[in-house]
């Protein structure tokens, strides 16, 4: 088991729990996904830049920022879909 495996085993559960508290239990799958994304990103970035001074904080910040980005995108997409639906209802010719 390498250092990245050890870090994952030590941090992943805690990160998912923290993100679930922040974003709600209804976003559990999102929390799991962004934790995986953060670890994948770490493997890519740290290979070239080296691990940061506080890898746990880096991972949590990366995962939290990714979750916020995804939720914003979903909210924006939902809002745009409702706007299009609203416009199509008002522009429908009754004939």
Regions found by a protein language model. Give the residues of each.
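Short, basic/polar amphipathic helix motif occurring as a linker/hinge flanking DNA-binding modules
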Residues: 70-92
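Acidic active-site catalytic centers that drive phospho-/nucleotidyl reactions
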Residues: 32-33, 37, 69
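Key residue(s) within conserved catalytic/signature motifs
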Residues: 12, 51, 56-60, 78-84
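Hydrophobic-face residues of short alpha-helical interaction/recognition segments
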Residues: 15, 19, 59, 63-71
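A short, charge-rich alpha-helical start-of-domain segment used by transcription regulators
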Residues: 1-18, 23-24, 28-32
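ATP/adenylate-binding site constellation spanning eukaryotic-like Ser/Thr protein kinases
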Residues: 12, 36, 64
